[in-house]
């Protein structure tokens, strides 16, 4: 969905605001995330390769934050998938 891609920074900032993320948490875990695509109502989010070791942590900690935020912002139910970017 182009709307999610076009508003990706706004999505991340909404997650930061709605869930009261500290500056450190936001800059470490959320800011580096990149929108990849939407297929069958699943939003794929790229985790940079230097954070690949934290895939499980990021998924367990932030998946629901992104799912709720994106669903509310775009008025459509989405699931979230985190993938890591290979160099």
Residue map of PLM features:
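Intrinsically disordered, low-complexity basic tails and flexible linkers associated
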Residues: 1-87
């Amino acid at each position: 969905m182009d709307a999610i891609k076009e508003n990706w920074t706004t999505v991340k900032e909404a997650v930061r605001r709605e869930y009261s993320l500290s500056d450190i948490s936001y800059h470490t875990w959320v800011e580096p995330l990149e929108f990849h695509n939407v297929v069958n109502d699943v939003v794929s989010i790229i985790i940079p390769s230097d954070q690949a070791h934290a895939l499980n942590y990021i998924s367990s900690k932030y998946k629901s934050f992104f799912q709720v935020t994106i669903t509310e912002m775009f008025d459509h139910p989405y699931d979230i998938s985190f993938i890591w970017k290979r160099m």
